[in-house]
């Protein structure tokens, strides 16, 4: 079990450290320092404790030379580091006590830390959970990503609209990162490739010339295992110019030219997912991807060579690159380039090594999210990489033709380069030795639908790894009241073995345990109500049902279905003032991509509906609607702990897995959802009676998509109550100043638009089923004991959904890693 730091943690030493950090960082005594300065001083003191373990970990890896996974991801949504590090050091209470003695409040200090703006949604949070589990399970790993200056954006809600402002999370510095200038690498863009024959070897040689380049400089952030000595590194790359400043140009008055290289570097790391509605944005995204991938692969190869006498031929025995979605797929061609152009390997040998080294996780069923690049852009920006991809494609197309003679349809679907585009998912599948989906249903859909041709040709590559979450952050840190109660009941083994929660099943019928559990939920609701009052100025009743949907805003996630139902419910109450219902607080939180128009309109709709409902005294507070601004990991932790109902209402077959569903479940909420993604497995664990399922099945959705037969207009014409709700989108009820404000939403539900079907995501089709499920939730909540038993069962059955289980499966079945305990 976890080794507490208590034995070698000196409270006095720690206090001294904090005081001296304040002096050396700010020339201030602790009493004079402001909250942000105190946060920095405390963080440096905690980092001091981490450093020895961090050094020991890397010494251990040098000594044992274990196989290492490089987890490559565009996003790492880490959340705040201070509290998480204190928990994984098993020193939270000791440090809190030391700070108390200095007259400092740990909660105030933790609140000073901005969330690291390195990700946006589930993809990035999964990567963060995986890093936590890898270190806790003592597996050697690097996370590889980009050190974004502003991340995605900070969301502000102004007059109901989402406004994107830069998220300047680094403005006060990140106390936990360490710059590693000694591992800098050049990354080249553009130019052309000159080839010549080497007379000595008779080989064709390729040299990129006339290119522009930037220098990638890594910053390492410690990722601590819980209760052990392992500290792995999240390595995020910053871009610096090759030549900082051109004095010559400056002196000649060409100020633009003087800082040109600086700007090239700066742009690459400015933001996550620059808007790719335009050519420049597309180019910048591809630059970002190649930038961090090239630097990471160069470093991994160099590290391997330094430990293996300069030889690269067995690198696959010690290195594996896991591609988290399609963004890092250029790693395939970059590894080929390094093996051939820099290490003199022939094609066949390089390809053999590459295909034993790279593995791919597919995260989406949505075709538009499988990246494709115009040949013109790809070949101009990455000329040598494009040549290599072209050759991979040529050889693979020959394989297809040999296996399926005369079948041009197979070529069309499977070729890496086709129709003027480079298809990154196809490259990842062809080169990867493993292709995994992230929930059982998702993997089955990939095999039978989206990637069927690949599955038929290379079935041995495909496997499923259902996602998970780290209980250290999402229960132990996010919900200390519940965490302590669980430990009191079953011991603290669950912190590193979540399957132990099953022991709580002994208590689900115990009236006293039920009362305690619901009292904890109530206190967490009071905490969230306070947050809402402070941030939204809205009073919400902790005795109401907290019905929550927090996640990225996308049409398939159907925040629209949720708010249309709220409008419907409001109509019911207005028609019948004595309408009998348990008061309900509908809580939303979501960022919409800056260029995603209808998603942003949905946010405006939610806020306008909230404005009308929250200010209507006649409904006596039966409904409140809250949109939480700038949803992120840190406020997510407060939200998950307080939810009664977890809205997981994506159109069946569209959500690969989802992980928010697991966070709510772990904290004792009931899933109101479709049979989609990991919801299917949640229902398998808790039993259908402990969830509230509605809507079309995945098979039904796919059938409608393939064969047609659904007309939303029919529902509109025949269902008066649904028609009333839709008419309110265009009659000014929620936008008196502009009746056309929500016309696009109305049209998307009822009118075909070019190639797009009306109601693409079956909102009206599922509406009645959803409304009925919501009515049942109301009914169930009134049965106090039945409800308590259901939500306690959800917590007790959450064991499967730990990222520790997921990582154990990746490590043993895909990566073939060996646990490497760190001795100190």
Task: Go through each PLM region and give its residues.
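A conserved ligand/cofactor-binding region detector
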Residues: 1-824
């Amino acid at each position: 079990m976890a080794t507490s730091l208590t034995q070698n943690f000196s409270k006095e030493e720690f206090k001294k450290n904090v005081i001296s950090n304040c002096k050396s960082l700010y020339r201030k005594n602790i009493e004079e320092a402001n909250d942000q300065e105190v946060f920095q001083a405390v963080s440096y003191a905690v980092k001091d404790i981490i450093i020895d373990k961090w050094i020991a970990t890397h010494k251990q890896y040098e000594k044992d030379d274990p196989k290492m996974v490089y987890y490559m991801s565009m996003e790492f949504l880490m959340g705040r580091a201070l509290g998480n590090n204190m928990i994984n050091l098993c020193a939270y209470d000791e440090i809190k006590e030391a700070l108390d003695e200095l007259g400092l409040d740990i909660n105030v200090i933790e609140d000073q830390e901005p969330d690291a703006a390195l990700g946006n949604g589930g993809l990035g949070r999964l990567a963060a959970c995986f890093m936590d589990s890898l270190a806790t399970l003592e597996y050697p790993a690097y996370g590889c990503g980009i050190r974004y200056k502003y991340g995605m954006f900070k969301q502000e809600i102004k007059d109901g609209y989402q406004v994107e402002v830069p998220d300047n999370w680094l403005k006060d510095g990140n106390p936990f990162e360490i710059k590693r200038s000694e591992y800098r690498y050049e990354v080249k863009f553009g130019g052309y490739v000159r080839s010549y024959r080497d007379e000595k070897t008779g080989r064709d040689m390729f040299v990129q010339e006339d290119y522009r380049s930037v220098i990638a400089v890594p910053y390492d952030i410690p990722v601590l295992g819980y209760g052990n000595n392992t500290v792995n590194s999240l390595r995020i790359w910053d871009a610096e110019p090759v030549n900082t400043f051109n004095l010559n140009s400056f002196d000649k008055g060409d100020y633009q030219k003087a800082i040109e290289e600086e700007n090239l570097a700066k742009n690459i790391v400015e933001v996550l997912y620059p808007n790719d509605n335009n050519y420049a944005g597309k180019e910048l995204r591809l630059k970002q991807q190649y930038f961090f991938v090239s630097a990471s692969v160069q470093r991994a190869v160099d590290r391997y060579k330094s430990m293996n006498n300069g030889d690269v031929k067995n690198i696959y025995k010690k290195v594996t690159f896991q591609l988290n979605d399609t963004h890092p797929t250029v790693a395939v061609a970059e590894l080929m380039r390094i093996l051939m152009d820099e290490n003199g390997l022939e094609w066949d040998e390089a390809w053999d090594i590459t295909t034993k080294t790279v593995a791919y996780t597919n995260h989406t069923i949505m075709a538009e999210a499988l990246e494709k690049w115009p040949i013109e852009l790809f070949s101009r920006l990455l000329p040598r990489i494009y040549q290599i991809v072209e050759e991979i494609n040529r050889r693979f197309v020959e394989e297809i033709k040999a296996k399926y003679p005369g079948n041009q349809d197979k070529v069309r679907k499977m070729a890496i380069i086709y129709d003027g585009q480079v298809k990154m998912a196809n490259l990842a599948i062809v080169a990867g030795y493993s292709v995994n989906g992230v929930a059982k249903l998702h993997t089955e859909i990939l095999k039978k639908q989206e990637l069927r041709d690949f599955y038929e040709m290379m079935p041995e590559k495909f496997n499923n790894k259902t996602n998970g979450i780290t209980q250290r952050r999402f229960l132990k840190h996010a919900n200390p009241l519940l965490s302590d109660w669980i430990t009191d009941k079953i011991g603290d083994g669950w912190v590193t073995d979540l399957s132990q929660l099953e022991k709580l099943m002994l208590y689900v019928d115990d009236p006293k345990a039920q009362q305690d559990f619901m009292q904890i939920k109530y206190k967490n609701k009071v905490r969230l109500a306070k947050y809402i009052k402070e941030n939204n100025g809205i009073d919400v009743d902790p005795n109401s049902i907290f019905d929550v949907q927090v996640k990225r805003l996308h049409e398939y996630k159907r925040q629209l279905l949720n708010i249309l139902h709220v409008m419907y419910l409001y109509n019911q109450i207005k028609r019948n003032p004595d309408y009998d219902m348990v008061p309900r607080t509908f809580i939303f939180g979501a960022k919409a991509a800056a260029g995603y128009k209808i998603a942003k309109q949905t946010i405006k709709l939610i806020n306008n509906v909230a404005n009308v409902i929250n200010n209507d005294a006649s409904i006596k507070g039966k409904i409140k609607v809250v949109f939480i601004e700038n949803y992120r990991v840190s406020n997510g932790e407060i939200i998950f702990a307080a939810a009664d109902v977890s809205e997981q209402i994506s159109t069946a077959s569209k959500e690969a897995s989802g992980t928010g569903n697991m966070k709510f479940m772990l904290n004792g909420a009931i899933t109101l959802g479709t049979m989609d993604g990991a919801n299917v497995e949640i229902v398998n664990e808790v039993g259908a009676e402990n969830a509230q399922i509605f809507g079309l099945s995945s098979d039904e959705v796919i059938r409608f998509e393939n064969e047609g037969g659904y007309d939303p207009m029919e529902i509109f014409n025949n269902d008066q109550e649904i028609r009333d709700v839709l008419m309110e989108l265009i009659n000014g009820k929620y936008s008196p100043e502009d009746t056309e404000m929500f016309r696009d939403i109305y049209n998307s539900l009822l009118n075909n638009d070019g190639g797009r079907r009306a109601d693409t995501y079956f909102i009206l089709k599922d509406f009645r089923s959803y409304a009925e499920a919501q009515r049942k939730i109301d009914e169930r909540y009134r049965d106090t004991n039945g409800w308590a038993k259901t939500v306690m069962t959800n917590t007790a059955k959450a064991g499967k959904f730990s990222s520790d289980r997921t990582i154990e499966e990746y490590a043993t079945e895909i990566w073939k890693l060996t646990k490497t305990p760190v001795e100190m």
